[in-house]
Amino acid sequence: MVQQSQDQQVYRHVGYVMNDREDVATLVGPFLQSALAAGEPVVLACPDAMATALAAVLGSDRQVHVVPAEPQEDRPPAALAAMADLIDRDLPGDGRRLHLVTGPGRQDDASAWLQTEALLNHVLAARPVDHLCLMAGGETADTAAAARATHPWLLTAEGLVPSPGYRAPADLLRDLQRAGLPDPLEATEPTLAMVDLDDMRVLRRALNRVLAESALSADAAQDFVLAIDEVTANAAEHGIPPVDVRLWCTPERLLCAITDHGACFDDPLVGYGPAHGDMAVGGMGLWLARRSVDSLTASPADDSGDGCTVRLVVNA
């Protein structure tokens, strides 16, 4: 067993894939009891049955807090914000670490779940938290592989061990993005195409007209227009013209591809946390755009590596 580091400013993300051969409460109990013995709080944000079983093992210690297990948001930015809020509500703030247990929960979108688990290591890096994620082994065929890739630590019958398959969040996200390119919709005729765009007002009017006939609700359409507007304005300001905008609408999903001829940004972590939090100052556009869509990716516009195409996807 590897002893836990005492670094008070490191988010420690621990994965445990459950199986029928092990009693979860018996295995997890000692892991949490050591935290209580050190005077550090434990928060159980699990489904009722799991929270009850763990609380029974831990006893009536006043440092054990059971909170409702909210369904995980499908969109990674929303899921990350919810997790940060949960942690910040209970973080002691006096130098002690918080010990959080979440899951198991249903994962409707395996790709979004994988992105969220990877991004937790980036977004929460400075918080002094030990976060134990419980995962049901039957959720997907490769749950164990996903746990190893997204959790630097694993809880096993032998104790806490480094994950042999852990990958840096940026590397994992790059591979996930590349696997989905090009989007199959791009082989079809776009619903809307605007070449060499030079007037954002014309774009907004066209988007509002087309999206009014789409499968999106009025609020979702407004959010999508906001995201497209932010990315297009960024391309016009920082890229190299011409800027082209193409939109595909189907009953299931919508895709907008914004292309310019400047250099493409290669950091998939950009925009997953506001750089400064001041909406009156620039630099918040990508953060806003990510929160308004189901997926935002950037890649070179062609095989030569020239140009940049940002793809925004919303599931209807």
Label each region the model flagged.
Residues 1-197, 306, 316:
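Non-catalytic sensory/regulatory segments that transmit input signals in bacterial signaling proteins
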Residues 28, 116, 228, 282-285:
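Amphipathic coiled-coil/heptad-repeat helices and related helical stalk/stem segments
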Residues 40, 129, 216, 241, ...:
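Short glycine/serine/threonine/alanine-rich loop segments
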Residues 114, 201-205, 287:
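Short, well-ordered alpha-helical segments
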Residues 182-184, 236-316:
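Conserved beta-strand-loop-beta-strand hairpin that lines the nucleotide-binding pocket
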Residues 186-190, 222-233, 237-239, 273:
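Coiled-coil dimerization/phosphotransfer module
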Residues 197, 201-232:
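Conserved short strand/loop->alpha-helix "switch" segment adjacent to the catalytic nucleotide/phosphoryl-transfer site
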